[in-house]
Design a protein with these regions (language model features):
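A structural motif corresponding to the C-terminal lobe/cap of the Radical SAM core domain
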Residues: 390, 395-401, 409-411
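A conserved beta-strand-loop-helix scaffold within acyl/acetyltransferase catalytic domains
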Residues: 19-62, 70-80, 109-113, 232, ...
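Acyl-donor binding region in acyl/amide transferases
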Residues: 82-192, 315-390
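Acyltransferase donor/substrate-recognition loop-hinge adjacent to the catalytic core
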Residues: 179-258
Length: 411
């Protein structure tokens, strides 16, 4: 097996198509989570919101057929964040939140990442443990070439987009905006000397099991008594909601050791297709009773019907046919995904999140959803997990990042 840098459109197509092909070969089609192909194409062309160069790599077998893939990239901001603490800091309680041979014929390409202190990897796919072992060896080889002292991932391309690797619960399917991988991935990384970093869990709440007290909508009198109001979101009002949540989002997550500030361009990219998919009743935007329509949210929860069945059918391509598919089948999507929630640090500890989740649970019940799934809650943030535990939820997957110091130090 050997590593091959993706350079042509044909190789880019092979990189993109490898994920659904391997999932079908392994019998994991109903478990895997495709990345948006538009994101992968932008990484390859060095366009889009992510400012750093991204290298796309394939591991190919003796016949030249791809058997594994990854991206390698740098991020000075993320490298500085994780270097600041060898032990992940506690998240705030109101916040949720991912070959020995190489093709080196292009010296300019080899220097494209400069000399990063940390080499990040992501978008992992591997046919089996042998292919993954070659891929891990190549990631280390590439880090040595670039002079990186640390290797960290998976992040695609940042933890605030998609990050982490499942270490338990791989028998459960993945869902939108989170990671899924076969069980052998974590075993291979541990065997290669990587240490787990920032363990976390996803959660699942069976809507029919939510206690009545946690699924009763907040009354207008309760909102008023708390000096609050819920701003209703329409499809036409989604852009304004995105503008309001961004400052709250960045403030709420600023202390997390893996979180880098989200730009307007990044958030807009991550919201692609949301207008066609959203259920307005599941988007929570809490403001002060006297706040204007443009005042940033005091608390928010971004929840959508899980589009993964449609995205799997289209291999992660969110083109016109996929959008039409979403519109036609939107009412058949009975699982919801809480992508992100946050509370302005100035308003945390006042019970606002509990009220927001009550309204959310009430809407889930009223609209006939089967379950709510929640992305990535760090294990050192039990207060946030407790919100969903009180709603009858249970952990679904365990996951972590994987970290290796190339100078021999272990975390």
């Amino acid at each position: 097996m050997r590593a091959k840098r993706v350079r042509s459109r044909r190789e880019l197509k092979a990189f993109i198509d490898l994920a659904p092909e391997l999932a079908a070969r392994r019998g994991d089609t109903d478990h895997y989570v495709p990345l948006f192909t538009s994101d992968i194409a932008q990484w390859h062309s060095h366009s889009g919101w992510f400012n750093e160069d991204v290298e796309l790599w394939l591991i190919v077998d003796e016949s030249g057929a791809p058997v594994a893939r990854t991206i390698c990239h740098s991020s000075p901001e993320l490298a500085a964040k994780i270097a600041a603490s060898d032990r992940p800091a506690r998240a705030t309680s109101d916040d949720v939140m991912p070959s020995n041979t190489t093709d080196t014929t292009d010296p300019a390409g080899e220097a494209s990442l400069g000399r990063p202190s940390t080499l990040f990897f992501g978008a992992l796919e591997a046919a089996d443990a042998e292919a993954l072992d070659h891929l891990i060896a190549h990631i280390g080889f590439r880090a040595d070439q670039l002079g990186a002292r640390r290797v960290f991932g998976p992040v695609s391309p940042l933890p605030n987009v998609t990050g982490g690797m499942l270490t338990a619960g791989t028998d459960r399917p993945g869902f939108f905006d989170t990671a899924w991988n076969p069980a052998f991935y974590a075993d291979s990384f541990h065997a290669a000397g990587f240490a787990s970093w920032g363990p976390a869990q996803t959660w699942e709440v069976e809507v029919g099991s939510i206690p009545a007290a946690r699924a009763t909508a907040v009354t207008e009198a309760e909102w008023e008594a708390s000096g609050l109001r819920r701003r209703r979101i329409s499809r036409f009002g989604l852009p304004a909601f995105v503008r309001r949540l961004l400052p709250t989002l960045n403030a709420a997550f600023a202390q997390l050791p893996y979180y880098t500030q989200i730009s307007t361009a990044q958030l807009k990219s991550q919201m692609q297709g949301l207008t066609a998919l959203m259920d307005p009743e599941l988007i929570i935007d809490i403001a002060g009773i006297k706040d204007s329509s443009e005042t940033p949210s005091r608390c928010f929860a971004l929840v959508i019907p899980d589009p993964l069945p449609v995205l799997r059918r289209h291999g992660g391509r969110l083109g016109p046919s996929a959008i039409l598919d979403l519109l036609v089948h939107r009412h058949e999507l009975r699982d919801a995904v809480l992508i992100i929630q946050g509370t302005d640090p100035d308003f945390q500890g006042r019970g606002i999140l509990s009220m927001a989740i009550r309204d959310l649970n009430s809407a889930l019940c009223a609209k006939g959803y089967r379950r709510l799934r929640v992305t990535f809650i760090a294990e050192d943030n039990p207060a946030s997990a407790a919100v969903f535990e009180r709603s009858g939820g249970e952990p679904m997957h365990s996951l972590s990042f994987f970290d290796r110091h190339l100078d021999g130090r272990r975390r």
